[in-house]
Amino acid sequence: MDMRVPAQLLGLLLLWLPGARCAIQLTQSPSSLSASVGDRVTITCRASQGISSALAWYQQKPGKAPKLLIYDASSLESGVPSRFSGSGSGTDFTLTISSLQPEDFATYYCQQFNSYP
């Protein structure tokens, strides 16, 4: 059996070697918060270096897969209510829920797509 790896594939694999690129760290705040229905809620995400607008926001409820809310920092995913909005670029980003609804009580995550560890 021919086990040679095509050069193009090998090149792609090398891009994914651990440590091949400097990891970008994200810091969310607050780590937790208390809020009531109808409140305006703001969550921030800060990147350790500039990532342009390569940031997404996800909502996760217990036992469920994360749900994409916002991509490219400010673009609303189809089907997501307009009370969710995202802003920012570079290193500082914000997710805002304009009027919190009962179904919005969940965990929220930011994720960057500018580079990979």
Swiss-Prot record:
Q: Where mainly located? A: secreted
InterPro entries assigned to the protein according to its UniProt record, in alphabetical order: Ig-like_dom, Ig-like_dom_sf, Ig-like_fold, Ig_sub, Ig_V-set, IgV_Light_Chain
Q: Where is this region: Complementarity-determining-2?
A: 72-78
Which intervals of the chain are annotated as region Complementarity-determining-3?
Answer: 111-117
Q: Which PROSITE patterns match?
A: IG_LIKE
The residue ranges of the Ig-like domain are 23-117
Keyword annotations from UniProtKB, A to Z = Adaptive immunity, Cell membrane, Disulfide bond, Immunity, Immunoglobulin, Immunoglobulin domain, Membrane, Secreted, Signal
- Family annotation (Pfam families): V-set (PF07686)
Key word Secreted present: yes
How is this protein named in the record?
Immunoglobulin kappa variable 1D-13
Q: Which organism is it from?
A: Homo sapiens (Human)
Gene for this protein? IGKV1D-13
